[in-house]
């Protein structure tokens, strides 16, 4: 518990400090591929109009906005993040979108009732949570039976040429971007290590299953640099079945 608390405080500090440059940093680090990946994930999700969605670790609300457009005026989207400064950036971007609500909260202790959402997403945020399984179990808890959870995250490339390039990029190029946009060595080192140490696609699939998700689907993007994991909360069985 003490370790988790220290880790939370460290991550909170990082994102409080990089909030104003986060979007720019994300675009540069991913060569704007994160936008392409998100569009492909949204296509896989086939979000229904009028749905209620939760975007965990919403950051500056990019995925929250995409979900808002997908659910339409009759739907509702809540974006949750633990960084007040990240949410301030998100609030500016979503101020004219009436079906979005942004709230501060902890991904490991979601402030919502059981069985509340049709969709729960987390984009490039799971790697920054001290305990992946606790966060995934919380996502499962707040989903309605049969609801969909989706994670878009960096991954570990399996194709040799991508794997070598990825390792070189993280070792030599990413620190340069970090120094330009982060305010301290600790911040850019965290951004680098959290992505580099994140589970590969098969390991994360196993964690999804451990958290209770069924029919978990996995899609890799750009040679495995990023991956989508999509799973469902088990449907309730009718009494007498």
Curated annotation (Swiss-Prot):
It holds the Pfam family Ubie_methyltran. The gene is menG. Belongs to the class I-like SAM-binding methyltransferase superfamily. MenG/UbiE family. SUPFAM superfamilies: S-adenosyl-L-methionine-dependent methyltransferases (SSF53335). Signal peptide: none annotated. Gene3D superfamilies: Vaccinia Virus protein VP39. This is Demethylmenaquinone methyltransferase. It comes from Staphylococcus carnosus (strain TM300). PROSITE patterns: SAM_MT_UBIE, UBIE_1, UBIE_2.
């Amino acid at each position: 518990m003490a370790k988790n608390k220290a880790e939370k405080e460290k991550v909170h500090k990082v994102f409080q400090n990089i909030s104003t440059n986060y979007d720019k940093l994300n675009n540069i680090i991913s060569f704007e591929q994160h936008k392409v990946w998100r569009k492909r994930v949204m296509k896989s999700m086939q979000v229904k109009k009028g749905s209620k969605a939760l975007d965990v670790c919403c950051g500056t609300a990019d995925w929250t906005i995409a979900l808002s457009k997908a659910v339409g005026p009759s739907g509702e989207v809540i974006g949750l993040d633990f960084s007040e400064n990240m949410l301030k950036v998100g609030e500016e971007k979503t101020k004219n979108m009436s079906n979005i609500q942004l709230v501060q909260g902890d991904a490991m202790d979601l402030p919502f009732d059981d069985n509340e959402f049709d969709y729960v997403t987390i984009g490039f945020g799971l790697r920054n949570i001290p305990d992946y399984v606790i966060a995934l179990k919380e996502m499962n808890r707040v989903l309605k039976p049969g609801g969909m959870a989706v994670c878009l995250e960096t991954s570990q490339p399996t194709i040799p040429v991508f794997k070598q390039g990825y390792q070189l990029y993280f070792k030599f190029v990413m620190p340069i971007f970090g120094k330009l946009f982060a305010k301290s060595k600790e911040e850019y080192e965290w951004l680098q290590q959290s992505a580099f140490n994140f589970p590969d696609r098969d390991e994360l699939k196993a964690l999804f299953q451990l958290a209770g998700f069924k029919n978990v689907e996995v899609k890799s993007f750009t040679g495995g640099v990023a991956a989508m994991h999509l799973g469902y909360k088990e449907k309730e069985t009718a009494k007498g079945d």
